[in-house]
Curated annotation (Swiss-Prot):
The gene is hisE. SUPFAM superfamilies: all-alpha NTP pyrophosphatases. PANTHER family: HISTIDINE BIOSYNTHESIS BIFUNCTIONAL PROTEIN, HISTIDINE BIOSYNTHESIS BIFUNCTIONAL PROTEIN HISIE. It comes from Burkholderia vietnamiensis (strain G4 / LMG 22486) (Burkholderia cepacia (strain R1808)). Disulfide bonds: none annotated. Signal peptide: none annotated. This is Phosphoribosyl-ATP pyrophosphatase.
Length: 121
């Protein structure tokens, strides 16, 4: 990720954060925040489904730009969700950096071991 890309994510996250106390009649993001957890999480599900459908369309000759647009929608709504739960893109980036260099199998085994240890096992 380039510094410019990270800056874009952080700028967008700052705008989203600024909408937390905003007027739900004036801002889509403020409206989602105002509606609460279920509305934010439902939107993530809807956007994820649209990504899957767009990806399938690309395999059948659909426009790759449609997939990019749907992924952008999903990422945006994931940023809204992170903000809603008082998290930031930096938290996700830190987790990705922590996982970097680990195989998926190795990372999953470490996660399961940590879960067992946390549960007293």
């Amino acid at each position: 990720m380039t510094q410019s890309t990270e800056d874009t994510l952080l700028r967008l996250a700052a705008v989203i954060d600024s909408r937390k106390g905003g007027d739900p009649e004036q801002s889509y993001v403020s409206r989602l925040f105002h509606k609460g957890d279920d509305a934010v999480l439902k939107k993530i599900g809807e956007e994820a489904t649209e990504v899957v459908l767009a990806a399938k369309d690309v395999r059948q000759g659909g426009a790759p730009t449609a997939l990019v647009g749907e992924v952008a929608d999903l990422w945006f709504h994931c940023l809204v969700m992170l903000s809603h739960f008082d998290l930031s893109p930096a938290d996700v980036i830190a987790e990705l950096e922590r996982r970097e260099g680990l195989s998926g199998i190795e990372e999953k085994a470490l996660r399961k071991r940590r879960e067992r240890e946390a549960n007293g096992g």
